[in-house]
């Protein structure tokens, strides 16, 4: 894609050719769209303008969304905003053109000019844009005044005594910030004069006032520089440089700004604005011109001479007439005045757009420090104007007044050329269009536009629209403003991570090179000498230049973290405010600590007032209980946010620790170049679909013993094709093999326990929604409720999710006593199917034991009672009647009870889409009982009841059978220990492990077939001896784009511009290129040209209207009519060559580093003399034949085998040890599932080994393979669902049978050990898998906290399975080299995956963001972002080539000691894994956000039943707890009091809790549920009800019984509970 010639470039691969072809096609389509859309181009005759637009235009539907998504920030009615939001529309085209005067008698030419800057300056009445202040509750200490005071303190910084002189200080980056104005908005006098002179007559009509309009300033880069310079140089002649040391006055260009002669009126057609409801929506524009804009100075009477062929055209004649209206004159009265606010804001915007991260050594001297600072700022701005904007170098000016190295000047020219000439094709989607794809939306169709990154605003809008469409009840419950706010801040976590991480390149205010540092430290070696020195030392022939964040005394003089952040934002107070609001949004309701502790400021812990922040001049954290107006300072907010991002508890220890690491990131300047290894943390954007390389790079497998490798040995030579096929199959690329496995075997889940989210059936979707909507909050569920896969290269990997509900129903729908399937009618009428199919799992040859349900009712009931009281025999064969039915439809008690249980299952888990609520379903049940004249307690009372005569014998029998069996099964679900094979948890775990076993077997069979082995057994033999992986490391390369135009986030823009600056600096350093007078676009690498011809689309001016303004527009129709004539007349339309976004490569090493305790080994000619003993051991193992025929267990960590294999004192397993183990243990994958894999004799041994391993699962200091962690998490999730259902059933039947039956705590270990005793093979499979995962898996203990669990589990299963079955490791083939001696580490080699998750996944809470499929509507699914540490590396081209290439390289310390490291929840030891985390733009993202300070509907809040939501709302809303307390008291008939406590009489706290739970939280009406309600909600309420709220009593044990629904009095309810308990005991006795 580079334009420079490469004489020895390698031949392009087929993939590269395809990509280049796709890119060329995309460029052609982009140019075609621009050519066919005249509104995208137009004459931009001015350099800036001041616009007045009615406030009504900003009251559109998506006002909140655009205000946040485009990062509008206002203080005191003034600030900055995105041009995309503020532009009137087509008046400011994205591809502006300007007429250029030609020689006398010739027509002017049309050429491209700079567009307006992407940020505008809001001057007045911008309060209507400040949506965050309306929605995000801020304490006074975080208000606009506090931010203003913080900025004033930054302006007052001065160099310390002895640290630097004023001259040196001003030469440093940021030294000029102390001269920024303290003004928060323009002077009232300035705005009053401006409005009276240019706008008042136009806007004040038809009842309109000045207060009804927003005033803002728009300017192109050169005009913005002039605005900034004029404020700093107010006392200096703007036309000249002042006399310096040599007393020479050097003339400069006219840098003045002049207002035009007219105020124009333009139509507002920006689709983001509320133009539809505003009649005749217009904006009033006063243009201004830069002094160098000579064409519009009014010197020409006609721009087209009469002799020109086009003069006779009406189109041109009209423009000749309008020309004078467009001009300006250099009169004194037309000079544009500039106030301090405009100048300072313009300076910050310019410095953000063109960062100067290096020292500028001034040569002028003066005694006036204030004047010197002004000149220093002026020089920096002039440097930007001349080099970055105009791309010209004036040695006679620059060299005489200040010194900048030639390398830096070239880098600035390089960066400026990219900034001004790069065009983002996808930026069209957000310019003067609505949130939808808009005017160039067709560009996103298909795959053609996947070459470049899409805009974040389009991604956010698409996500929000999809949430509205597919979000269901959650979307309906969210009000529009909350929804828009959530999506507008969709990337808040990555943004804050960049700002608060002081190792981020965003915070690199000064960068230096290794060569510069060497010069500063007195190293006189030249670059050439340094290269030669490194070459002699055996290093790279090319000197590896690096970029480092250098010491900056200005930055380090700041102690407050808030000031440091403000400093790195170039003093932009409005941008700082928006970041602080992002932090408040991220924390939401968790700003204050739950225990209300007052924390001490880490910097002032030893002071007299440790809670007072001397930086922010307020309390550090005033979060005490009882303090009504809680507040905190900026330091606390920043540290509290860092705790949230790093998943740390906000304790005093953690906050102090973070302070020590971040408040003073670099106290001392560097003193040596030997440790010049600083890596920047960057947040770069990539496109996943464009990156063809997988995480496994170019690693290949080979079989050294087979002549043709993996080719089919039976392949016959036909037409010379044998050689080609043999060559292709000689080696197999690991990437292709893993992809094939992920496609053929996408998941290890059992078919009865999984749901395919890509091809979800109606029934599976029903189960999925039940589980997601009912249990996600109440269980703290960690499952991924995501519709659609996110696997790489469109494999189905990641699309299969575990379904607990489906798993449990599968167990209940199987009948171990029947050998045939049958259907059973449901007992209770609820939504869904009316019958259930019961699958008979009994072996057909055991048919004698089948039971008939037609025996004597008395005997059946007696048998059932025995089972209920745990005295029955397993299998339920006690009944005396064992008759058979010919049709096989067994009507035994087991089947009836299962049907009843299925009914109860749906009762306890109501469908969110069902027509009946939980209460309504319960009412339906009671209605059924009444219709049948059955008393609900009749089952227990009928021996003595008169109502027995009302029932038929059949009805009585069925009711008894169903109810008693349900009681038994419920008890089995919640009993403490797995006592029998009928235990539901045991069945679920057994089914899960059976799925794992079958997966490994299918995987082995697939690999054997794929690699052309005749059998799994044959493949196993070669795996033990000859299958190896070639390549010492596995690399992955990703493509990334630096495309600031495609993001509206100022932080992301600044970051990408600094990356580009560092890239340019590194390139010139490494290439040692001389500075060119004019930057040649061919020197810009990895950019393609986009030729866009200039179109003759001229302005048109209408007649003066009643408001005194002329209508300004574009003569598009005239241009279309005369386009042919313009071409025939020879009009020059030379295309301007724009550049595609700068593409960079990111190289990632996905091999895990070696452990430090493994010594280096010498390999000479492929031999290993010092490990001959170890090789002899393995040779003996391979030759030894084991004939036991079954699986032999071993110690999981295999320490004894490690020592025997030559690994002394090592806990590390590697593939060589696994080869030893698999051979010794006689692992035969082909025997899995056939009954011959494992022996029951080894059960105790395996159980003991696994028990020891399971005991380590609770140890947080022990790292475990991610695959094993996820498998255990899955099993625990399913069994926890059993507990939850058991609790619901206990609540349903509690009054009758469960008053004394306690809920058990599930123990996965006990269940697994029980499974091993019954299924020895499954225990062996788990044992084997743990060892394989220890070797080939990733030791990242995320526990589903951040990563996409389904994807991580199944992708790891594929890698672990392939590695273990083929026993792949770096064999001798990888160690052979042309070098006589080669040093290599032969230790464990783990293939680490690309961990993919979604952007802004709730890293703080470990889940909770719902996502829906966007594959049908979103066009940017391939978008990704990377958070990681990068360093620049350089390498030469092929031999004979002079080309030098540069890449970004992912460093070994991925996420090391940075905030992203804590986000990833990896310890220091884990960082060596170099796990690459790909943060995908979420298809749908919404985090519930409750605005502070608004009225809360208490009834609506309580009806949601979300305890976490209620808790957070109480914490975030002042006075709400007391209001809810009054609400609760009124609901139980007690009058609340405004002051003091209510009269509670004899009602204890436990009784109060019971009543409140019964009335308002009936779904939590069981013991555990009550405790949960009390802990999360009532703890805030009891303090307003009872005086002593220090200790809250634990509520008494009780069961919920609804007397009103059963038509029973409350007094009878108490008696009934007692009778039920007594009669239940009686039944147990009778059962015996």
Swiss-Prot record:
Keywords associated with the record: Glycoprotein, Host membrane, Membrane, Transmembrane, Transmembrane helix
Biased amino acid composition, Basic and acidic residues: 842-853, 875-890
Domain of life from the UniProt record: Viruses
Keyword Metal-binding appears in the UniProt entry: no
Residues with glycosylation annotation: 149, 274, 654, 719, 797, 1012, 1031, 1261, 1339, 1511, 1546
Extracellular side: 87-1632
Membrane topology, from the record: Single-pass membrane protein
Subcellular location: Host membrane
Transmembrane segments: 64-86
Region of interest (Disordered), ranges: 1-23, 516-538, 838-890, 1603-1632
Record-given protein name: Uncharacterized protein ORF22
């Amino acid at each position: 894609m580079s334009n420079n010639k490469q004489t020895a470039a390698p031949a392009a691969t087929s993939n590269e050719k395809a990509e280049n072809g796709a890119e060329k096609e995309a460029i052609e389509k982009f140019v075609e769209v621009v050519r066919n859309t005249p509104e995208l181009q137009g004459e931009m005759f001015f350099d800036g303008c001041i616009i007045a637009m009615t406030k009504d235009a900003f009251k559109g539907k998506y006002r909140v969304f655009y205000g946040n998504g485009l990062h509008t920030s206002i203080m005191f009615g003034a600030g900055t905003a995105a041009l995309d939001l503020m532009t009137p529309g087509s008046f400011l085209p994205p591809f502006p053109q300007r007429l250029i005067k030609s020689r006398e008698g010739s027509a002017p030419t049309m050429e491209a000019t700079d567009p307006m800057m992407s940020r505008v300056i809001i001057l007045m009445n911008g309060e209507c844009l400040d949506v965050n202040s309306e929605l995000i509750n801020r304490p006074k200490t975080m208000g606009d005044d506090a931010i203003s005071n913080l900025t004033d303190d930054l302006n007052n910084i001065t160099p310390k005594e002895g640290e630097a002189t004023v001259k040196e200080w001003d030469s440093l980056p940021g030294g000029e910030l102390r001269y920024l104005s303290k003004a928060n908005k323009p002077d009232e006098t300035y705005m009053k004069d401006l409005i009276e002179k240019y706008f008042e007559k136009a806007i004040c009509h038809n009842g309109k006032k000045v207060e009804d309009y927003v005033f803002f300033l728009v300017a192109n880069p050169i005009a913005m520089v002039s605005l900034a310079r004029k404020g700093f140089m107010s006392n200096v002649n703007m036309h000249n440089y002042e006399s310096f040391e040599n007393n020479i006055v050097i003339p400069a260009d006219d840098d003045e700004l002049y207002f035009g002669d007219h105020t124009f009126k333009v139509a507002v057609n920006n689709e983001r604005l509320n133009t539809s409801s505003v009649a005749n929506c217009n904006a009033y524009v006063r243009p201004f011109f830069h002094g160098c804009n000579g064409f519009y100075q009014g010197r020409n009477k006609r721009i087209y001479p009469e002799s020109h062929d086009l003069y006779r055209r009406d189109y041109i004649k009209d423009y000749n007439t309008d020309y004078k209206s467009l001009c300006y004159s250099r009169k004194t009265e037309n000079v544009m005045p500039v106030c301090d606010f405009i100048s300072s804001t313009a300076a910050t915007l310019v410095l953000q757009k063109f960062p100067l991260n290096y020292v500028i050594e001034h040569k002028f001297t003066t005694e006036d420090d204030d004047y010197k600072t002004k000149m220093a700022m002026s020089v920096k701005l002039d440097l930007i104007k001349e080099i970055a904007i105009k791309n010209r170098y004036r040695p006679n000016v620059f060299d005489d007044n200040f010194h900048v190295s030639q390398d830096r000047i070239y880098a600035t020219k390089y960066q400026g050329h990219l900034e001004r000439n790069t065009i983002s094709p996808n930026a069209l989607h957000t310019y003067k269009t609505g949130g939808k794809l808009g005017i160039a939306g067709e560009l996103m169709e298909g795959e053609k536009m996947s070459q470049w990154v899409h805009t974040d605003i389009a991604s956010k809008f698409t996500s929000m629209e999809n949430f509205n469409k597919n979000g269901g009840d959650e979307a309906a419950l969210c009000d529009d403003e909350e929804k828009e706010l959530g999506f507008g801040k969709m990337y808040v976590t990555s943004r804050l991570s960049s700002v608060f991480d002081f190792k981020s390149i965003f915070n690199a205010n000064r960068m230096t090179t290794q060569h510069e540092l060497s010069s500063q430290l007195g190293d006189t070696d030249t670059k050439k000498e340094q290269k030669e020195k490194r070459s002699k030392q055996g290093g790279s022939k090319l000197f590896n230049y690096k970029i480092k964040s250098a010491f900056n005394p200005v930055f380090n003089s700041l102690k407050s973290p808030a000031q440091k952040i403000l400093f790195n934002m170039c003093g932009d107070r409005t941008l700082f405010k928006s970041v602080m609001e992002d932090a408040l949004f991220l924390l939401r309701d968790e700003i204050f600590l739950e225990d209300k502790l007052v924390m001490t400021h880490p910097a002032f812990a030893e002071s007299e007032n440790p809670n007072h922040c001397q930086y922010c001049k307020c309390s550090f954290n005033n979060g005490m209980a009882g303090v009504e107006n809680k507040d905190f300072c900026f330091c606390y907010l920043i540290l509290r946010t860092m705790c949230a991002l790093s998943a740390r508890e906000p304790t005093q220890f953690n906050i102090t620790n973070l302070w020590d690491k971040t408040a003073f990131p670099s106290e001392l300047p560097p003193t040596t170049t030997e440790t010049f290894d600083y890596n920047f943390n960057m947040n770069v954007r990539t496109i996943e679909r464009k990156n063809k390389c997988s995480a496994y790079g170019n690693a290949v497998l080979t079989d050294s013993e087979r002549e043709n490798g993996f080719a089919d040995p039976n392949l016959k030579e036909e037409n010379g094709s044998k050689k080609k096929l043999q060559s292709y199959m000689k080696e197999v690329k690991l990437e292709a093999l893993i992809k094939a496995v992920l496609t053929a075997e996408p998941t290890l889940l059992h078919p009865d326990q999984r749901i395919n989210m890509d091809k979800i059936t109606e029934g599976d979707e029903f189960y999925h929604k039940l589980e997601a909507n009912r249990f996600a909050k109440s269980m703290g569920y960690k499952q991924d409720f995501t519709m659609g896969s996110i696997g790489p290269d469109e494999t189905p990997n990641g699309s299969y999710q575990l379904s607990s509900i489906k798993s449990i129903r599968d167990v209940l729908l199987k009948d171990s006593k029947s050998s045939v399937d049958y259907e059973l009618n449901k007992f209770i009428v609820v939504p869904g199917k009316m019958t259930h199919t019961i699958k008979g799992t009994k072996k057909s040859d055991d048919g004698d034991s089948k039971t008939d349900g037609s025996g004597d009712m008395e005997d059946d009931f007696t048998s059932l009672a025995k089972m209920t009281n745990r005295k029955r025999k397993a299998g339920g064969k006690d009944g005396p009647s064992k008759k058979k039915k010919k049709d096989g439809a067994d009507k035994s008690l087991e089947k009836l009870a299962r049907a009843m249980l299925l009914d109860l299952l749906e009762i306890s888990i109501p469908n969110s889409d069902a027509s009946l609520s939980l209460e309504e379903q319960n009412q339906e049940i009671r209605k059924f009982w009444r219709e049948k004249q059955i008393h609900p307690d009749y089952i227990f009372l009928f021996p003595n009841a008169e109502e027995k005569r009302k029932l038929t014998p059949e009805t009585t029998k069925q009711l008894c059978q169903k109810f008693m069996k349900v009681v038994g099964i419920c008890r089995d679900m919640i009993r403490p220990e797995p006592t029998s094979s009928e235990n539901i948890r045991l069945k679920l775990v057994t089914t899960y492990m059976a799925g794992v076993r079958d997966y490994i077997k299918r995987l082995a069979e697939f690999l054997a077939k794929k690699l052309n082995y005749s059998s799994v057994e044959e493949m196993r033999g070669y795996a033990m001896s000859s299958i190896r992986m070639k390549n010492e490391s596995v690399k992955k390369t990703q493509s990334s784009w630096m495309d600031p135009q495609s993001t509206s986030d100022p932080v992301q823009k600044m970051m990408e511009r600094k990356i580009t600056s560092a890239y340019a600096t590194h390139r010139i350093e490494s290439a040692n290129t001389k500075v060119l007078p004019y930057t040649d676009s061919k020197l810009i690498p990895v950019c393609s040209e986009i030729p866009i011809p200039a179109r003759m689309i001229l302005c048109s001016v209408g007649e003066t209207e009643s408001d005194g303004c002329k209508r300004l527009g574009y003569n598009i129709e005239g241009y279309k009519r005369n386009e042919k004539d313009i071409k025939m007349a020879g009009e020059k339309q030379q295309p301007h060559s724009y550049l595609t976004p700068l593409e960079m490569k990111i190289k990632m090493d996905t091999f895990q580093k070696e452990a430090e305790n493994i010594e280096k080994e010498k390999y000479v000619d492929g031999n290993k003399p010092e490990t001959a003993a170890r090789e002899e051991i393995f040779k003996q193992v391979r030759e030894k034949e084991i004939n036991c025929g079954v699986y032999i267990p071993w110690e999981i960590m295999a320490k004894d085998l490690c020592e025997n294999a030559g690994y002394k004192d090592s806990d590390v397993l590697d593939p060589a040890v696994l080869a030893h183990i698999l051979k010794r243990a006689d692992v035969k994958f082909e025997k899995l599932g056939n009954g011959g894999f494992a022996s029951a004799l080894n059960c105790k041994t395996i159980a003991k080994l696994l028990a020891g391993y399971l005991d380590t699962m609770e140890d947080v200091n022990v790292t475990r393979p991610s695959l094993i962690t996820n498998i255990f998490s899955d099993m625990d999730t399913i069994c926890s669902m059993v507990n939850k259902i058991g609790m619901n059933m206990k609540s349903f039947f509690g009054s009758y049978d469960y008053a004394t039956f306690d809920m058990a705590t599930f123990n996965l270990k006990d269940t697994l050990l029980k499974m091993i005793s019954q299924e020895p093979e499954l225990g062996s499979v788990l044992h084997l898998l743990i060892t394989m995962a220890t070797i080939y898996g990733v030791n990242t203990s995320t526990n589903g906290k951040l990563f996409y669990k389904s994807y991580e589990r199944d992708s790891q299963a594929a890698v672990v399975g392939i590695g273990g079955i083929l026993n792949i490791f770096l064999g001798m083939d990888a160690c052979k080299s042309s070098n006589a001696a080669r040093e290599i580490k032969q230790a464990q080699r783990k293939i680490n995956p690309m961990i993919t998750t979604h952007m802004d996944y709730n890293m703080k809470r470990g889940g909770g963001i719902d996502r829906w499929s966007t594959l049908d509507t979103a066009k940017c699914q391939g978008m990704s972002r990377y958070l990681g540490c990068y360093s620049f590396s350089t390498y030469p081209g092929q031999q004979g080539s002079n080309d030098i290439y540069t890449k970004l390289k992912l460093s070994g310390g991925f996420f090391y000691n940075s905030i992203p490291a804590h986000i990833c929840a990896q310890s220091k030891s884990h960082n060596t894994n170099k796990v690459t985390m790909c943060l995908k733009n979420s298809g749908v993202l919404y985090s519930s956000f409750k605005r502070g300070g608004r009225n809360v509907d208490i009834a609506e809040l309580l009806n949601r039943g979300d305890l976490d939501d209620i808790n957070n709302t109480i914490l975030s809303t002042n006075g709400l707890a007391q209001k809810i307390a009054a609400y609760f008291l009124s609901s139980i008939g007690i009058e609340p009091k405004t002051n003091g406590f209510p009269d509670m009489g004899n009602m204890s706290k436990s009784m109060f809790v019971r009543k409140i739970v019964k009335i308002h939280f009936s779904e939590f009406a069981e013991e555990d549920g009550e405790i949960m309600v009390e802990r999360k909600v009532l703890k805030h309420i009891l303090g307003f009800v009872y005086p002593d709220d220090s200790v809250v009593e634990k509520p008494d044990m009780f069961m919920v019984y609804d007397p009103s629904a059963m038509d029973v009095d409350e007094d009878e309810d108490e008696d009934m509970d007692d009778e039920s308990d007594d009669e239940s005991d009686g039944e147990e006795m009778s059962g015996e």
